[in-house]
């Protein structure tokens, strides 16, 4: 059985509002036309069953983000000790990444072999794990399980700001391709330790994967991507 679980993350800088993203998280049955792009396969009759694990205030969310940035800038300016340089005292960049948008999604085969209740249990535990480890996933500020699409998934918004050290830790939380690949392994292993039968997705950075990809592309004279690799 294909029991892979996907973990994806995108960065959002402090100049970008999250209201539209939050509206999507808060979507209702009547909103289908706004979010159904022909690919997502929305089931609006199921929207009422979406599960909120951490529900934010959509009207104050971005204001609270701004306040955290202002608090950091104020405290940085107040650094008077000689150990701090002018760089340490200056404001955060205007395009500082302060939020992470994260999605957790089991494979279609895993979903087809488990009940909706089991899917909710898995995704709820994924949320709990992320909540317990802000050093890996940021400080969770919003989380919802979408059951109104063809494949149930968890959507999480978390803060990437380090309020103690007065900086953004987005680079450490996301990292480069290699670090992200390692994090996907850590994520899947964390859920396995909690009793769930899941594996990380395909490791496209591994030597074995690259060698097999090259072999298949030469054999079939076609590019192998994550969208078609299961056919070969």
What is the meaning of each model-derived region?
Residues 1-232:
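N-terminal nicking endonuclease/strand-transfer module with a His-rich metal-binding environment
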């Amino acid at each position: 059985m294909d029991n892979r679980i996907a973990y994806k993350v995108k960065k959002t800088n402090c100049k970008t509002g999250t209201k539209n993203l939050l509206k999507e998280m808060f979507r209702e049955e009547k909103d289908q036309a706004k979010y159904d792009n022909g690919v997502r396969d929305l089931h609006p009759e199921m929207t009422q069953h979406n599960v909120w694990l951490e529900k934010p205030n959509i009207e104050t969310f971005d204001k609270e983000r701004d306040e955290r940035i202002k608090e950091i800038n104020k405290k940085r300016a107040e650094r008077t000790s000689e150990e701090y340089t002018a760089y340490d005292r200056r404001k955060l960049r205007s395009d500082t990444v302060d939020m992470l948008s994260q999605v957790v999604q089991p494979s279609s085969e895993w979903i087809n072999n488990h009940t909706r209740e089991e899917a909710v249990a898995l995704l709820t535990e994924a949320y709990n794990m992320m909540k317990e480890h802000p050093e890996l996933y940021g400080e969770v500020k919003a989380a919802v399980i979408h059951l109104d699409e063809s494949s149930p998934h968890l959507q999480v918004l978390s803060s990437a700001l380090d309020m103690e050290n007065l900086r953004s830790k987005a680079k450490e939380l996301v990292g480069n391709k290699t670090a992200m690949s390692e994090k996907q392994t850590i994520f899947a292993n964390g859920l396995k330790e909690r009793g769930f039968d899941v594996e990380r997705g395909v490791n496209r950075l591994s030597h074995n994967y690259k060698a097999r990809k090259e072999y298949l592309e030469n054999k079939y004279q076609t590019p192998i991507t994550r969208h078609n690799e299961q056919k070969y």
